[in-house]
Every structure is written in C-alpha cells, then in structure tokens.
C-alpha cells in the first residue's frame, strides 16, 4: 500500500509543478500582450489628439473665430 502511495506522489508532484510553470509562462505572455496593446492604444490616442488639435488650428485660422 505504501509503495502505491509513493508512486502516486511521484507522479502527482512533478505534474503539479509542471502545470504551475506553464501557468506562470502563460500569465507572463498575457502580460506582455496587454502591455503591447496598451502601448498601441496610447500611440493611437496621441495621433488622434494631434490630428484633432491640428484640425482646430486650421478651422480657427480659416474662420478667424478663435
């Protein structure tokens, strides 16, 4: 009975360690993707605000209302 429990433990622990390492790696990859998405959104916001700001200056310059 003891040898059966010992063999089950020898199979169980490496499996759980391997699983936790895979989950850590997956979490790290997701964090990298999230950072890349956040950077792209920040760039898009910067471009959009720059375009809108330039548009306002053009409208003010052409209409003379500002």
Curated annotation (Swiss-Prot):
InterPro entries per UniProt: Frog_antimicrobial_propeptide, Nigrocin
Native species: Odorrana grahami (Yunnanfu frog)
Intracellular or extracellular location(s): Secreted
Signal peptide region: 1-22
GO CC field: extracellular region
GO-annotated biological processes: defense response to Gram-negative bacterium; defense response to Gram-positive bacterium
Keyword entries, A-Z: Amphibian defense peptide, Antibiotic, Antimicrobial, Cleavage on pair of basic residues, Disulfide bond, Secreted, Signal
The name this protein goes by in its record: Nigrocin-2GRa
Record-stated family: Belongs to the frog skin active peptide (FSAP) family. Brevinin subfamily.
Propeptide cleavage-removed residue intervals: 23-45
């Amino acid at each position: 009975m003891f040898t059966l429990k010992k063999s089950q433990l020898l199979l169980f622990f490496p499996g759980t360690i391997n699983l936790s390492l895979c989950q850590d790696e997956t979490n790290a990859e997701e964090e990298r993707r999230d950072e890349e998405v956040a950077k792209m959104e920040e760039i898009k916001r910067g471009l959009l605000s720059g375009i809108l700001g330039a548009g306002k200056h053009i409208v003010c310059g052409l209409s003379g209302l500002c």
